[in-house]
Swiss-Prot record:
HAMAP family: DapB (MF_00102). InterPro entries: DapB_C, DapB_N, DapB_N_CS, DHDPR_bac, NAD(P)-bd_dom_sf. One of its GO terms (biological process) is diaminopimelate biosynthetic process. NAD(+) binds at G10, P11, R12, G13, R14, M15, G99, T100, T101, A125, P126, N127, F128. The active site is at H155, K159. This is 4-hydroxy-tetrahydrodipicolinate reductase. The gene is dapB. NADP(+) binds at K38.
Length: 266
């Protein structure tokens, strides 16, 4: 396979560290630079726990893109920074794979239009774990037969956004096969505000944040005399790397924006 030159934004995070290791062990990936505002001017190998890769680190993406030739930007930063980076990447005509979440429908629509206009491949993935993507697809299928559903997502206590992008994407897919319906008793009253979680078109999403967790989600469907639960668990961040690898390889052949890995797997 042809070499793919990659820039990683956010190499010091746990996902970023795993992505650097992915670069090291994948023959056709070449890590040409990284973006980290705290370590501009250093090299990847200078960071604690990193492999002996000598890709330069830039403090900001603007400077990096001015000085480095790359094929793909892999962004694993924060929602706020990720939005800035994908916008800049599209403007510069650089393909990007975005692992941050928190995009609004309006922001996605604008990015989709811009990527189409520039004919630049872009993938925004709420979850890179292939198992999680299948969980979402299975939930979408089940919603055709089970109209009563709630979502519980559980993550580590350092996660910045709630509900998770995976939960939001799951509900979006379920809504495609489910009539609008308020889940629970029509006259129910919350004795404590927020007790029933977030509400999206009648579907409740419950977010749990605890140390010891990584990324977990279960989608619970109820029916007469039966329950169906679709669950996925990521026990470490290596579980996301197969999806990262697939996304980097796939985005090379795209000329538009794709939201969600379910749209690039068979």
């Amino acid at each position: 396979m042809k070499e793919i030159k990659v820039i990683i934004a956010g190499p010091r995070g746990r996902m970023g560290h795993e992505a650097v290791l992915l670069m090291e062990r994948t023959e056709h990936f070449n890590l040409v630079a990284a973006v980290d505002y705290k370590h501009g001017g250093e090299k990847i190998s200078d960071l604690p726990g990193m492999p002996a890769l000598h890709a330069p680190i830039y403090a900001d993406l603007h400077t990096c893109l001015d000085e480095v030739e790359a094929d793909v930007l892999l962004d694993l930063t924060t929602p706020e920074v990720g939005k800035q980076h994908v916008t800049l990447a599209v403007e510069r005509g650089l393909r990007s794979v975005i692992g941050t979440t928190g995009f609004t429908e309006e922001e996605l629509a604008r990015l989709t239009e811009n990527a189409k206009e520039k004919a630049v491949g872009t993938i925004i993935a709420p979850n890179f774990a292939i198992g999680a993507v299948l969980m979402m697809k299975f939930s979408q299928m089940a919603a055709k037969y089970f109209q009563d559903v709630e979502v519980i997502e559980l993550h580590h206590d350092q996660k910045l956004d709630a509900p998770s992008g995976t939960a939001v994407k799951t509900v979006e897919l379920i809504r495609q096969n489910r009539e609008s319906k308020q889940q629970g008793h029509p006259n129910e009253v919350e004795q404590l505000a927020g007790a029933r979680g977030a509400n999206v078109d009648g579907i409740h999403i419950h977010s749990v944040r605890l140390p010891g967790l990584i990324a977990h989600q279960e989608v619970m469907f109820g029916g007469d005399g039966q329950m169906l639960t679709v669950r996925h668990d990521s026990f470490n961040r290596a579980s996301f790397m197969s999806g990262v690898k697939l996304s980097i390889e796939t985005v090379m052949n795209l000329d538009h924006l794709v939201y969600g890995l379910e749209n690039i797997i068979d």
